[in-house]
Amino acid sequence: MKRGKKYRAAAQLVDRTKLYSPLEAMRLAKQTNTMRVPATVEVAMRLGVDPRKADQMVRGTVNLPHGTGKTPRVLVFATAERAEEARAAGADYVGADELIEQVANGFLDFDAVVATPDLMGKVGRLGRILGPRGLMPNPKTGTVTNDVAKAVADIKSGKIEFRVDRQANLHLVIGKTDFTEQQLVENYAAALDEVLRLKPPTAKGRYLKKVTISTTMGPGIPVDPNRVRNLLAEETAAA
């Protein structure tokens, strides 16, 4: 794949022979933004798990202290009082049968989905549409609940969901390039802590194998996966 001049210039700023501290990586991410507007900052983690095994599926949520820089659009499947509570909490789309039909017909203009337990029998038919996009409501992530107001508020304030893919990778948005370096590191730390907490007991060998920080259209920045404490320090380790 041929890269543009801006990308090549940004890539030259990254030393591929070293592992950066989280603070240095965030600083570099801001410097390597090739877009004219603030870009999304993402962290990719390669985990030492086998996602084919049910007991090694890493999935969870984390409340980022500084949010993602984007106000997510939340869709809620609910009726009656729960529907009103969802609207009052700021949900962007609220409904039941008609809304389920809209999604089944291709409506996907939202970033998160919440559902009340009584509607999951009907929402289940959307599994093939929502599942691959990581949008299917799940009790483990707090998105199947009767407390829809709290679920909506959590998502709007920076709660993100993550799930390991078939290649044992996790991808999480941790902010934008107009965040301060400290804000990005603190969001990264919150995500890292939760991923480490969810290490499956059956996982063998090194759990956190590789960490890369990147921006939209920007180069990957290798981060020292052994740095799990004192993340605001400057030191780096040799690759």
UniProtKB/Swiss-Prot annotation:
Pfam families: Ribosomal_L1. GO terms for cellular component: large ribosomal subunit. GO terms for biological process: regulation of translation; translation. GO terms for molecular function: rRNA binding; structural constituent of ribosome; tRNA binding. Binds directly to 23S rRNA. The L1 stalk is quite mobile in the ribosome, and is involved in E site tRNA release. Protein L1 is also a translational repressor protein, it controls the translation of the L11 operon by binding to its mRNA. It comes from the Bacteria. NCBIfam families: rplA_bact. HAMAP family: Ribosomal_uL1_B. This is Large ribosomal subunit protein uL1. Keywords: Repressor, Ribonucleoprotein, Ribosomal protein, RNA-binding, rRNA-binding, Translation regulation, tRNA-binding. It comes from Acidothermus cellulolyticus (strain ATCC 43068 / DSM 8971 / 11B).
